[in-house]
């Protein structure tokens, strides 16, 4: 019996001394009822299935393209059973959601404008080498299946991750190789003539970048180096696009004619343009956002009212045309006059304010304002056992720094759903997190779990980069010793034909309207020395790398200005808040871990109960002690040291011990945790007026503190004790006082 015909193509990525990677695209075997399906392999041991399907009818009432991208992480792909209660996959992991965004962002602009049929792309991870990162493979898989589906799609789109390792940009790096990388970028693009146009960038400095740069002399990811990385990604993207195009030419379905719903017809655009263009020019010279929005809404109502009788039943088209005319007015003013909506020049930054310690009791807090964008950052510190546990296909199983971003509807003066975070909020939190991770202190330097929350209280452009700035302030206020402060800025781009030539204008610190009416949202975060994170989204089919390089340099000037404002508010870490827990680290021999824990956890539980501290022990012998105050932490440290780093007791040493048990032949006294001695019944006579002791409990009781002296240590290390009576203690004190006096006399 003959099976289905399988067709394939391959892209071989040559990384020189780092070896070759083979990306194989295959179709014809799996998911044959989907409109388009493709299996994509990387080096034969990681396999993803991408399936693209489309609804048969357009979605009614939709004025946008209903594209859905999903990633299904199957735990069997890594030979694991899910760790959830029901032992099956549930809601998508954060990594899966971020992978969805990586695919959606370059794919969405490539669909024909006006498509209203629902399109769904589902990528399922079927097999994975734990050392591989699957997200960038998923970009290529989703592009491949969409090309095969017969949808109106201007692919192929290639995606590649390049990492700067030992001064070389390496494509498709493995997790193990990323430990030596200082910077990594996911770049997606398409072939445009003889060049590659970039459609999406997601980049960050690595966790180890600071140490690699400062201690090992690795190349810092400056704007120039990042620009080189964008150029280095182009040949890889081209090879991936060519492999996809080769398979699509042989196996793709014919493009289906789908109904296209234009936002408006030409006759309505001409009427709206004639009625509103001149007035809109005046409206968009108003600097204040609310006043400008109110004037724009009033003009829109006026235009709709005046034209509705002429274009009966086409009010939606009039509204859409009004938005298009607004966009045209704003863009032409920027390109021709170099003046923006609020009257700023292309490189001007709005008014900045920065303030720390804005909330009581929390461990760290700050507010950062840029124009009408207002972000509050709040930092919480806790024991390392509170770090996030991760159950995903990634080899990363825990995360010490957790950055959450909240965008309530009131931040834009609207109503809406509140509750669990949406994909956008997860993406913005991840971006701010990546911007700050490279400058965080190590676990050894600062043994705390850190949760950073960014509250977008007011939004008019780039709340994610505002979150980076507010977080820098808040972390320093909480006492986190950052290696360097980080600031972020959002850049925009407007491009159009002016006098027969394509002209580009890069905008610094974009407004929300400039984001909506522009062609690019380009976010750049970093220190004064290098870039720590980048995110690029575009509405165009691609942007020349030279334009992006110029925008990077423009962003650096803005970043340095913002860093000056942050440093004026707080330039060194504050003292830890009195409400923050105190965490200290103790190193003990690995073979002593069992003694500290004790049988069934008896010893460690006893220390925690006695001191009120929380204790966690790492496999390497590092013990983290957390307590609400310093004395509790110090007491726990002393108790642990007494067990794991003990001094050998000697005859004659005195201790203030605690009676832990009484027997017919005496009392056991605890000197230090794990070290007890016997106070024999005959010795108890010394504290019973020399009388015979018939019942030990009549003389001492469990829990009683008693001063004792070690009188004997037998061959097995057993300690014999004697009580220190008042006369003995006084004599000992006199002898100790006499010794320095005699020394001085001599």
Curated annotation (Swiss-Prot):
It holds the Pfam family S1. It is an enzyme of class 2 (transferase). GO terms for cellular component: cytosol. It is found in: Cytoplasm. Residues 652-724 form the S1 motif domain. Residues 581-640 form the KH domain. Keywords: Cytoplasm, Magnesium, Metal-binding, Nucleotidyltransferase, RNA-binding, Transferase. It catalyses: RNA(n+1) + phosphate = RNA(n) + a ribonucleoside 5'-diphosphate. Mg(2+) binds at residues 515, 521. Its EC number is 2.7.7.8. Involved in mRNA degradation. Catalyzes the phosphorolysis of single-stranded polyribonucleotides processively in the 3'- to 5'-direction. Belongs to the polyribonucleotide nucleotidyltransferase family. NCBIfam families: polynuc_phos (TIGR03591), pppGpp_PNP (TIGR02696), PRK11824.1 (NF008805). This is Polyribonucleotide nucleotidyltransferase. It comes from Renibacterium salmoninarum (strain ATCC 33209 / DSM 20767 / JCM 11484 / NBRC 15589 / NCIMB 2235). The lineage of its organism: Bacteria, Bacillati, Actinomycetota, Actinomycetes, Micrococcales. The gene is pnp.
């Amino acid at each position: 019996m003959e099976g289905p015909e399988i067709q394939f193509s391959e892209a071989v990525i040559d990384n020189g001394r780092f070896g070759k990677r083979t990306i194989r695209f295959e179709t014809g075997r799996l998911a044959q009822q989907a409109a388009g399906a493709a299996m994509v392999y990387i080096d034969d041991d990681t396999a993803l299935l991408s399936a693209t399907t489309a609804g048969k009818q357009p979605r009614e009432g939709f004025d946008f393209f209903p594209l859905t991208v999903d990633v299904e992480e199957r735990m069997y792909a890594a030979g694991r059973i899910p760790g959830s209660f029901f032992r099956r996959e549930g809601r998508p992991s954060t990594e899966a959601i971020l992978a969805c965004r990586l695919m959606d962002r370059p794919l969405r602009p490539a669909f024909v404008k006006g498509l209203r049929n629902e399109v769904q792309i589902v990528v399922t991870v079927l097999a994975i080498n734990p050392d591989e990162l699957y997200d960038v493979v998923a970009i290529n898989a989703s592009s491949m299946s969409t090309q095969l589906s017969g949808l109106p799609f201007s692919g192929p789109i290639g995606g590649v991750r390049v990492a700067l390792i030992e001064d070389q940009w390496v494509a498709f790096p493995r997790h193990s190789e990323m430990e030596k990388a200082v910077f990594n970028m996911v770049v997606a693009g398409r072939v445009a003539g003889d060049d590659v146009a970039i459609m999406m960038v997601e980049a960050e400095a690595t966790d180890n970048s600071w140490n690699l740069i400062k201690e090992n002399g690795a190349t810092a990811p400056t704007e120039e180096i990042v620009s080189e990385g964008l150029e280095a990604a182009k040949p890889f993207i081209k090879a991936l696009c060519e492999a996809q195009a080769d398979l699509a030419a042989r196996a793709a379905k014919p493009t289906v004619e789908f109904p296209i719903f234009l936002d408006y017809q030409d006759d309505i655009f001409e009427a709206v343009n004639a009625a509103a263009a001149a007035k809109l020019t005046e409206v968009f010279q108003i600097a204040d956002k609310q006043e400008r929005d109110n004037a724009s809404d009033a003009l829109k109502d006026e235009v709709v009212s005046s034209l509705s009788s002429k274009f009966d039943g086409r009010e939606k088209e009039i509204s859409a045309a009004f938005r298009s005319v607004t966009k045209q007015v704003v863009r032409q003013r920027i390109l021709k006059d170099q003046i923006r909506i609020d009257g700023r020049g292309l490189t001007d930054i709005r008014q900045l304010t920065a303030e720390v310690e804005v909330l009581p009791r929390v461990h760290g807090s700050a507010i950062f304002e840029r124009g009408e964008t207002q972000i509050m950052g709040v930092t919480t510190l806790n024991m390392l056992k509170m770090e996030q546990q991760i159950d995903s296909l990634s080899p990363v199983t825990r995360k010490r720094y957790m950055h959450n971003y909240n965008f309530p509807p009131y931040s834009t003066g609207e109503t809406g759903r509140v509750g669990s975070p949406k994909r956008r909020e997860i993406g913005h939190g991840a971006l701010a997190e990546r911007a700050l991770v490279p400058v965080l202190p190590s676990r050894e330097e600062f043994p705390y779990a850190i949760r950073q929350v960014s509250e977008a209280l007011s939004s008019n452009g780039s709340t994610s980069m505002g979150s980076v700035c507010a977080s820098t302030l808040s972390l320093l206020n909480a006492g986190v010793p950052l290696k360097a402060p980080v600031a972020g800025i959002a850049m925009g781009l407007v491009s159009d034909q002016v006098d027969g030539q394509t002209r580009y204008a890069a905008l610094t610190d974009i407004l929300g309207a400039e984001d909506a009416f522009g062609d690019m949202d380009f976010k750049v975060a970093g220190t004064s020395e290098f870039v720590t994170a980048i995110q690029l989204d575009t509405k165009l089919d691609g942007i020349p790398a030279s334009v992006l390089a110029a925008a990077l340099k423009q962003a650096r000037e803005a970043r340095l200005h913002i860093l000056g404002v942050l440093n004026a508010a707080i330039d060194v870490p504050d003292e830890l808040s009195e409400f923050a827990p105190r965490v200290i680290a103790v190193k003990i021999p690995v073979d002593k871990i069992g003694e500290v824990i004790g049988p069934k956890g008896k010893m460690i539980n006893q220390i925690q109960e006695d001191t009120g501290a929380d204790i966690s022990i790492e496999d390497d012998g590092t013990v983290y002690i957390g307590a609400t105050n310093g004395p509790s932490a110090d007491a726990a440290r002393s108790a642990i040291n007494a067990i794991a780093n003990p001094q050998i007791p000697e005859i004659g040493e005195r201790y203030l011990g605690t009676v832990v048990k009484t027997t017919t032949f005496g009392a056991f006294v605890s000197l230090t945790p794990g070290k007890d001695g016997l106070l024999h019944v005959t010795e108890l006579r010394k504290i019973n007026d020399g009388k015979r002791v018939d019942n030990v409990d009549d003389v001492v009781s469990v829990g009683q503190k008693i001063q004792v002296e070690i009188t004997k240590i037998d061959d097995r290390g057993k300690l014999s004790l004697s009580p220190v009576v008042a006369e003995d203690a006084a004599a000992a004190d006199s002898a100790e006082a006499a010794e320095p006096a005699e020394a001085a006399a001599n």
